[in-house]
């Protein structure tokens, strides 16, 4: 439960107006995407979505930084083929679709029927990809998604707050487990990433997460560096400090 006045029901707009007088920005992890957007609407300073049910952009920054480190720099993100497997309706899948499209990547998302991304998010991703030279594929075929991919991603099959439903919710996802057989379909130098924490033996096997293609520990470290860079840039923007925007 929130320790702020939001926890007792204060309107988001009122909280935003108070924080405008106290801070250069807001970093908020919450459930409803609309709440973050309302905070941004009434804030005079930057608002960072630290995670919602719909999106997890801060994680994507770290993930793409990790790819850049292993692929020779940010300029080489364009036209990388990335594949996400599992719950393709969750915030990570949505974020890979939109973030990958912005970066000009070829994005493939695979999940079972009933767990595919919303049509409006797919449409937005395709529109952006058409402008950046990327591409979007949504499929129920894990092998199709992973074929010749440069990087394979997955996430837990059960999101925060749904742990009690694990046995039921996990049933549709076993065909999307990232294992050595599936990784063999990707490029020989393909990377494996997981935003962590992972359920070993569920969405990913120990052989993969501990194997030579796994860069999950680099990815975890980059959550620190990517967010430091984001806050530095946003703080400089809020203060009008051009030296922090370079």
Regions found by a protein language model. Give the residues of each.
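Short, well-ordered alpha-helix to beta-strand connector turns
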Residues: 23, 43, 148-149, 212
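Hydrophobic/aromatic ligand-binding patch that stacks against planar heteroaromatic rings
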Residues: 18, 39, 99, 182, ...
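Adenosine-phosphate binding glycine-rich loop
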Residues: 189-190, 195-246
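Short, conserved loop/helix-junction motifs that constitute active-site signature segments
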Residues: 76-77, 101, 181-189, 211
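Glycine-rich phosphate/diphosphate-binding loop of Rossmann-like nucleotide-binding domains
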Residues: 69-154
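Rossmann-like adenosine-cofactor binding region
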Residues: 126-207
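Phosphate/diphosphate ligand-binding glycine-rich loop within oxidoreductases
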Residues: 1-68, 200
